[in-house]
């Protein structure tokens, strides 16, 4: 498909996109001065590292960021607008608004690809008008050469919608700056074999391939660290990475492990973590920060795991935080993780509900549709808190999190669940509800927030927190009774398991993220029918039935909306959660008995529309058994490391046939833009921390980023320009 033969509106953020402010003043006001200082330095660490996301998104993203910082550090939005509208080839008012919308969306996603869906977005105004705005700026008047250089270095890529640039991915299916542009999936698979042999995990790595004049290939596996060489760089703790930093010959190919990826940015993270340590509340927080500092200094994943262990033990802190290379959704191979850092404040009243859910977990787990042999030997009671986000530095903000993602810690030592309360409440604001009857839309609007609260709780605690991985240990022993445990799908003894060097994410690779989200979503809708669960969240009788109905209706509707995140040209899903919800929709449609119906209709505007209906009387007798049978298969294939069976099952329900492709066209025509979040900013002067808030608008988003990152950033610019030769698309 040529660049001019497709609907460009799918790659534009409309001016009416909702922008919400994440309110946290009340929670922040409840902190002591010491806690505010602790939160402030964690906030700084989280956001300084968030610039790494630019380098992990696209070749041009850091340059666009630097351009915007230069423009808006020099003058206000109002001043720039006044000058731009007076120029000889002035943009219209609407075009200037489109410019601001693009800037806000770029900041909100920390890059020019959507954090939810991984598709590119471009400015909704001509390039010439965008240039007029840039060249009307005070920054241009002060230093034209610098502004022109930045603009010329990123403007073509900013606007390009060549097929492979439209989404993140491998080879011709997209771009990924986790890899040099000459890498494809086979390179990632080859290096994964090397990593397994050396017992190294790839969370904090990038892979760049170099080919010399004689055609000899050298793979450069870059570790994120402030350390730049193999020299031991840690005085206090053993530098377990230094000995790995060298060249290897692997299957006739040179593999070179180097340190120092993102070094200058991680130095700022480390400096602020060290400052935060002075305001920690207990020894677990001190030890946690020490290990994080060691991890970001040396590139050690093991140190980050140790920090995560202390984080788990830090029960019920008032100020909650997590930081590092955490989620691997955006790596097309599903192994390398995006940077994220957050700091938040506990909402005590809401957290009490989640604590009650944790207390009930041991009675709820046996109700899941698999034998007890597929469950962890001991339920490790996790923290489950509702948090108000103070700062979340990454490409997107989730509604709930279950971390850490390290299998051996989750299985043997525990984890934490968090629900981000001010994110959930922001989502509950009025918005247009598509594809439902008027009656359903009214009930949905009323109960979406409380029903989603139940779903998030179950999804995180008993979804991600349930199930066992069957492992054969190096000494030949098993962590399950391999002589008696039976595969529920074959009736035979267990034939497969995880071995040393294998994890869930490496074994299931690119399938792992969506598959696991689907498993957790299934647990949520399966268990939400439980009366005790509903009672914990304050829903009983008919009101509880309505919560169940809206939760299931939301899942079914989300499955239809998921089609927006499917790319038919390469048969790829671009968003793990939305693929998962589409899979669940397909399972429920297959259950039959008119439980779920998708009906093509003419909308009130006369254009094609779809009506989603769910028979609430059949949820328990048709829907729940169907989800239970499917969920059992998901768990068994996960437990037994049976990638082939898991892939066959998941691919079957992920398939989008001609019927659903037609529906996809309607979904795209009626899609509503995803909301953006403006976050507060903290400053400290003479030991006193202040909170600054911003308006919920594009201008407010811009002001918040200028407050966080005033002026130029030579560290980021050098990292960007050093990377560019490896990203030739």
UniProtKB/Swiss-Prot annotation:
Active site positions: 460
Organism expressing this protein natively? Nematostella vectensis (Starlet sea anemone)
Is rRNA-binding among this UniProt entry's keywords? no
Intracellular or extracellular location(s) = Cytoplasm
Q: Name one GO molecular function term.
A: metal ion binding
- Name the EC number(s): 3.4.14.4
Q: Which Pfam families match?
A: Peptidase_M49 (PF03571)
Cofactor binding note from Swiss-Prot or TrEMBL: Binds 1 zinc ion per subunit.
Please state the protein's primary subcellular location.
cytoplasm
Query: Which EC class, in a word?
Result: hydrolase
The lineage's top-level taxon is Eukaryota
Reaction it catalyzes: Release of an N-terminal dipeptide from a peptide comprising four or more residues, with broad specificity. Also acts on dipeptidyl 2-naphthylamides
Please state the gene responsible for encoding this protein. dpp3
For this UniProt record, the keywords arranged alphabetically read as follows:
Aminopeptidase, Cytoplasm, Hydrolase, Metal-binding, Metalloprotease, Protease, Zinc
**Single GO cellular component term:** cytoplasm
| GO BP terms in the entry | proteolysis
Name of the molecule in the record: Dipeptidyl peptidase 3
Please report which protein family the annotation says this sequence is part of.
Belongs to the peptidase M49 family.
Residues annotated as binding Zn(2+) are 459, 464, 517
Instruction: Answer yes or no on keyword Hydrolase.
Output: yes
